[in-house]
């Protein structure tokens, strides 16, 4: 059995399958992007490098690889359709742009090497091990303030009480900041009184209202360029701020609060880093920020923090991932438009290791509608088949898979073959005893294709009881098939009039038979 690209390459000179030559699309093609209405030049003169493809779950099977390596003219994957989401360099501006690429090669040369690298990258994603972040928060709660130190903060607490009803935020920030400075001026150099401990204490005890929390966030930002000189200190403060945000408000958050927190994050980046600060943030704080940005609907920042967690080998909580997927659906309104699906792939590209090894039912349900080719659907189904919760996942998703199979083409014979493939993939999960409720859905789907042979085979093999209600469903499906495929495959084995007559007489009651008479 040929299972590797190396073996495939040995056979390529023996097995040439000449396929109909397809005209290559223009090297440069102007395409409007729905997102901003601008037009860009889409670079589409070659198959993207395997590292440029961001599809998180497509894996060509051994047969797909063999066919590509054995096809002399225009070998392809995914039938050469323009559905492989890729991040490529614009040929002129050299900016990275998101496009749907065709995995269609000019000729057979180099196909095996391309496949070897693509498969190796997919294997690397499968081998990534993720572990949940430690939930120990003791280090965030240990504030190094003695009772003597807290007594020194009485003046600061009084200032907070006095300015509580003041509307001028800037004057309130200056008042608190001045009192902080007075505390440090009065304090002896021997005392271990640190700014981060004071701010964390104030946030924990006085940040119970949105107004006070905004005030303390602004004070923290002012202290960044004086006494807050370590990221360890900022981890403590951010943890307490985000805990209060979670406790005080339900989304949508106050715009002033959102602005204050995002200004603080920008100031932290400017203070400590030329770019972004994720590498120095504690995983728990990163997860808090991820949750916060998901709730505010900021998908770009959500993607950044989610991707950073995964790169650090940390498995985000399932509830956070589900909320992230929901936010994507809300943003795109569950759209199945080509551009929206391409953009969705950009937001879930980092989830590849989670899909492969830690996929949940909700995640799989999110991915099924994104498949634009049957081979993508099979890749996803094979991932589910190998997962630890395979049976539960298939129980919940199989009806969606069956429905999705019929969306790729209108050809009843191709649809019948694809339905059979799906059935053969899932049946071993049930020990060949596929539940009758699923078998009945397959039968109805075969009826929609006018495939009398497969209907009869499944009814007999799985001893399906044909109730009056179910027979009516079959009849409706067959009538739809006759309308949709009136001129196709009428003489094919399993679809012709003889098979129709045999099926009607053997499986339908007298009353139901009349409904299908010509």
From Swiss-Prot:
One Gene Ontology term, aspect cellular component: mitochondrion
Transit peptide start and end: 1-19
Main location class: mitochondrion
Alphabetical UniProt keywords: Mitochondrion, Transit peptide, Translation regulation
Subcellular location field: Mitochondrion
Presence of the UniProt keyword Transport in the record: no
GO molecular function: translation regulator activity
Family that this chain belongs to: Belongs to the AEP1 family.
Role: Required for translation of the mitochondrial OLI1 transcript encoding subunit 9 of mitochondrial ATP synthase.
Protein name stated in the entry: ATPase expression protein 1, mitochondrial
Lineage: Eukaryota, Fungi, Dikarya, Ascomycota, Saccharomycotina
